[in-house]
């Protein structure tokens, strides 16, 4: 991927790590191969792409972006593998930013919240089979195009971290100040999903 990009364009200015798999299952029921698949795609995919693009990004003083989720800040029940992978991406990129603080590398951790996309229909169940239809109302979510526009502006401004939705910002604020309240609200919020594994 990196070689093809450089061969065609001669440089890399921005790497957006956006590939991801989600899940819906309680950890007690989850087959560990599902967790491994999530980490391989979400976390290791980010690590490998960043590793091989990094020399070019350092040369261009470019941007590395990790698209995470509210689940990368606050543990979401029935999303243990997904949350773990997004926490790992955030930790990796925050550390990378500090390592290259004097090199001109821009690192952005981007948390869009629920976005209208097919990630939920492809989400894995406890045994790794896709769940099928999304349990959420996609029409009420931010469009992928709107999210992409906000992301492009954050890259232009060389923003360090961007969290989009009010609900996500509220959870982050509560998690720091009132963590027990945050835990309870996260549980209730996820339990309201149709066919939630928490019921």
Locate predicted features.
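Residue(s) in the substrate-gating loop at a strand-loop-helix junction
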Residues: 69
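SDR active-site lid
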Residues: 102-166
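Conserved amphipathic alpha-helix within the SDR
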Residues: 1-10
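Active-site-adjacent segment of SDR/Rossmann-fold oxidoreductases
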Residues: 10, 74, 95-106
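Substrate-binding pocket helix/loop in short-chain dehydrogenase/reductase
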Residues: 26-27, 31-36
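Active-site helix of classical SDR
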Residues: 50, 85
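Active-site loop immediately N-terminal to the catalytic Tyr-X3-Lys motif
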Residues: 27-28, 74-81
